[in-house]
């Protein structure tokens, strides 16, 4: 896994923060923005989109991933996530379990990076494996197809 340049980290944080204004959160007022860096250097963005029925709500991370996948892109390097009540960033916002599972579907847990940020000076970088040490993904089903 190559190191991520500070300038790219800053760009991903800025891009994720810019998504907060698009967040549709009339129920929780908890706004989340995400920026997804592909292996070829493209950046896809996402925000959370709530629904009165709650279950159809879509998180920022999945919005960004699904946007990329819907355009034929399936190789990802890093995602940056920011979030907070009313869009005020005071602590890290980690991906929910559903988002982690979607990441397991499309990302290498050993190398895919997750940046949790408050601003360009306050952030931590994890791998997907850090957040899903015993994650279930496509690799688990390779041998089960023979059954």
What are these model-derived regions, one by one?
Residues 3, 7, 11, 122, ...:
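Feature of Fe-S/electron-transfer and energy-metabolism proteins
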Residues 10-25:
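Short, basic/aromatic recognition patches
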Residues 16, 34-35, 64, 68:
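Small-residue (primarily alanine) positions within well-ordered alpha-helices
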Residues 28-29, 58:
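Short glycine/proline-enriched turns and hinge-like loops at secondary-structure junctions
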Residues 29-37:
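Short beta-strand scaffold segments in enzyme catalytic cores
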Residues 37-38, 117:
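Short beta-strand-to-turn element immediately C-terminal to the catalytic PLP-Schiff-base lysine
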Residues 45-140:
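Zn2+-dependent cytidine deaminase-like catalytic core
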């Amino acid at each position: 896994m190559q190191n991520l340049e500070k300038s790219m980290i800053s760009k991903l944080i800025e891009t994720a923060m810019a998504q907060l204004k698009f967040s549709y959160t009339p129920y929780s007022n908890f706004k989340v923005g995400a920026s997804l860096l592909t292996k070829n250097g493209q950046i896809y963005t996402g925000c959370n989109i709530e629904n009165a029925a709650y279950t159809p709500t879509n998180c920022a991370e999945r919005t960004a991933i699904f946007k990329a996948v819907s355009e034929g892109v399936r190789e990802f390097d890093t995602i940056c996530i920011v979030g907070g009540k009313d869009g005020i960033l005071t602590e890290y916002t980690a991906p929910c379990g559903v988002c982690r599972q979607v990441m397991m579907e499309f990302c290498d847990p050993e190398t895919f990076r997750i940046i949790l940020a408050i601003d360009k000076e306050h952030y931590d970088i994890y791998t997907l494996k850090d957040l899903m040490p015993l994650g279930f993904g496509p690799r688990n089903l390779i041998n089960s197809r023979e059954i």
